[in-house]
Amino acid sequence: MKLTVDPEADALYLTLKGGKVSRTEELADSLIVDLDETGALLGIEVLWLSYRVAPEALANLNIELPLGKK
């Protein structure tokens, strides 16, 4: 899992797993999900991030968490 903030795009992207994006669905005005060909969730994008989170909280917010297999 990887969390990335793009200040220029004013967006946050949470990568849940690797794979090829087959389709993208907008769940709300500022919430978009990427799905693979089977409909599995690959990532979540939150737009207009600066309206939701204080800019100083986002200054260096890039987190990568390896997911282990169970």
Task: Give the label of every model feature segment.
Residues 7, 35-37, 61-63:
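Short linear motifs in intrinsically disordered/low-complexity regions
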Residues 12-49:
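Amphipathic, hydrophobic secondary-structure cores in small proteins
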